[in-house]
Amino acid sequence: GGMLAEQMLVFFVLLFCFVVVGEKIAQYFSPGILNTKNTVKCMLLPVSPSEYLSPSELQQKMDRVVEKVRKSPTVIAFGKSKWLVPYTRPEEMYLSDSIQIGTRKMHVFLKFADKYMNQVFQLQMEEGEWLTDELLEDGSCPAVITSQLMQELGWSRGIGKRIYYKGTVFTVVGIVTGIKQEPLKASRPTMIVPNRIQPDQWFEYMVRVKEGETDNFRNLMNKEFNLMMGKEPVRLSFGNIEKWKLNDMRDVFITLLGIGIPTIFLFLFAFIGT
């Protein structure tokens, strides 16, 4: 009786491990995983406060570097965004805020992006088109929302719907399948709006390069950056988003393996002992 109870306990622990691993794998393949292969994050890092240029002026210089490098044959797409780049921070550290639809208010994740960012991450459009930084003909701002926000609102069609945020009117121009902020978590209700909504704050620069061209891109970017910045106390750093994603996933699965492997051995020994 005692041996059977031990076997049953080990069996249920092992079953729990398999269920958790299965859920994590299912969450990874759920809608909204961004394509980060062959992408590079370019980070502008002030070494010390500039005596001559403000942060916004430094950013304008960086914009000119990006505009020039964007024309390189090594580059597929080079964009600028805020809070859109995934896997760089825990989900709770991404920006979320309240939006209004009619009389209803709801809390959603907010992203800011330019017209290139959907090409950088190869976002999957379900309906409509990606946004630009230009106002629409009626004077409203374009917005793209995730299908999860559509579901939350109970909309069967989202294109043309109005959303209000901090006194600005947005018109939905596109729907994406999702935007996952962590690889092993589901996509959340999210709204993406143009960079112009918050023009004077920090931005994240992301590029998609052709296969095998990462080193050539970095060399070119460093060259143009140094030419533009001169002796300004600022440096350029590169981040590998794909590696960060894999590290995030590895940490989760190592924890699960730490539980699962001893449980498997206990399971085997429990049956060998019968």
Model regions: which residues?
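"Rare, low-scoring activations can occur
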Residues: V65-I76, S147-Q148, G167-F253
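Short, solvent-exposed polar/charged micro-motifs at secondary-structure junctions
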Residues: Y87-M93, D138, K243-R250
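A structural signal for well-ordered alpha-helical scaffolds and beta->alpha junctions
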Residues: C17, V21, L58-D63, L110-D114, ...
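Hydrophobic alpha-helical transmembrane segments of multi-pass inner-membrane transport and secretion
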Residues: G1-K24, D251-T274
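Short, contiguous acidic/charged loop-to-helix segments that flank catalytic cores in large enzymes
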Residues: I101-M106, D133-E137, I192-I197, M206-G212, ...
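Hydrophobic secondary-structure segments that place a key small or acidic residue at a functional site
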Residues: R104-P189
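Membrane-proximal extracellular/periplasmic loop immediately following the first transmembrane helix
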Residues: V21-R104
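Hydrophobic alpha-helices of bacterial signal-transduction systems
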Residues: A5, L9, V13, F18, ...
